[in-house]
């Protein structure tokens, strides 16, 4: 079932200023997205691969950090909880202190730049900071190099992280779990966090991974793509009926109030425990332009066809959905807003976020 959201747009535009009052926590796997920019004009004599002449390097937040960056860009107060790699250093008093490794320090610098709280970010000398290094030349990604560990956190590190999170729940309007299977979120840890949030009346929004089907019981909403949803129900989602059947099956499996299945160029489908029918929102993509100096504008692209770079689009959906519901929107309105935000970020290269001005302009374009 598709719905006309024309009547929702004025409500959502009035909702945007409320984002600045929201306090959102993000718990999950922290990553540094590193870009090596260069030029390529020749092939290597050693192999049939291009030689890239290095020009510059840039770092930005990935994983749970990208979720936090999306929330911060929309004006929310964000506190991030996760783990970076560390190294031990000897103090003058003779003791040892764990400091973030090079990538962890770069990640923390990115967090400070985005004004994201880092009190919940631990450095662990037994781990490395996850880094996704992309080599870009001629506007194309040549190769990606991953540096990471996927095993679970040590029990003492997990306990420290939980003890950092627990007192913060009193100030949070929502908590987002961003699970990339890099070791921070385990079944047991997720269950402890969900239980604590339930006791504190904090709604939880989850982007799950395929190895954890039953760890998120009690979440307000689960966000997954068609591939992940198909894995959960052990069959490919190839048409509307298979998507609807999967959504209905996942509600009791996850034990959550709602399931949101993102479908790329086909938009998203929303399933709620309280509704016998599902809601479908068609995709819309935008290309960010600047109509006037200093004034962000949105040029509407082709609906359901013009997709540029989907890196981090799922993080955008998760972020906006959680923030909008925390600010008072219905799940349907929040999903429509999240779908609109995703349509903006796919027009940007790499992991990206959307500003309130861009989102308001995109809503205006849809209304026209």
Residue ranges and their predicted role:
Residues 2-15, 23, 45, 49-131, ...:
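Substrate-binding N-lobe of the ribokinase-like
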